[in-house]
A protein has these predicted regions:
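A short, aliphatic-rich alpha-helical micro-motif
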Residues: 1, 125-126
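Conserved catalytic segment of ABC-fold P-loop ATPases
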Residues: 2-9, 29
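Conserved acidic residues
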Residues: 5, 128-130
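Conserved switch/coupling elements of ABC/ABC-like ATPase nucleotide-binding domains
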Residues: 8, 12-23
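P-loop/Walker A phosphate-binding loop and immediately adjacent motor/lid segment at beta-alpha junctions
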Residues: 21-22, 27-34, 144-156
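ABC ATPase nucleotide-binding domains
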Residues: 35-116, 133-134, 139-142, 154-156
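Short amphipathic alpha-helix with an adjacent loop that forms part of the alpha/beta core around
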Residues: 119-124
Length: 156
């Protein structure tokens, strides 16, 4: 993918796709090529992800900056529905959470977390049986996460 100018895809005994890496490594193309019916190909990671677990979220994950990825995959593997937030839509955690989480509370990139999104996250978190707080860095823009973390710690 990184060094090829063109890619030829063969399925069975015939050529089914030919094009640039950008054309080939698209979610729909990979799904059709490999017959992925219940799961996702994520072109950002170049990985195939299993489908999200259905149901009301049992766990709320406070994450960001890639800290949630291993937790999301573990919860999905253990068949536990989960919610996560508050994630910026340009955060690497968001890219996977959108595929695996039953609910993702988001914020616009580089914006301060709004009260509306903070309250939504609090409501979803309150309905969950368990909360996992990652060591997501907190700065000026995502300072609202401090309130969410404090509320989670009070539940312990």
């Amino acid at each position: 993918q990184k060094i090829a100018d063109q890619i030829l895809c063969v399925k069975g005994d015939h050529v089914c796709y030919y094009g640039t890496p950008e054309q080939i490594f698209e979610e729909q193309t990979i799904r059709e090529l490999y017959g992925i019916e219940n799961g996702f190909y994520d072109p950002r990671f170049g990985s195939i992800e299993l489908p999200k677990v259905d149901g009301e979220p049992e766990v709320f994950v406070i994450a960001g900056c890639g800290r949630g990825i291993p937790i999301y995959r573990k919860l999905q593997k253990d068949n536990i529905p989960f919610a996560t937030g508050i994630l910026y839509t340009n955060d690497v955690d968001y890219q996977l959470a959108r595929l695996l989480a039953t609910e993702v509370i988001t914020e616009k990139p580089f914006c301060q977390i709004t009260q509306e999104h903070l309250q939504k996250a609090m409501q979803v978190m309150e309905k969950c049986k368990k909360v996992i707080c990652t060591d997501v860095p907190i700065g000026e823009c995502n300072k609202g996460l401090e309130e969410l973390v404090l509320a989670a710690k009070k539940r312990m």
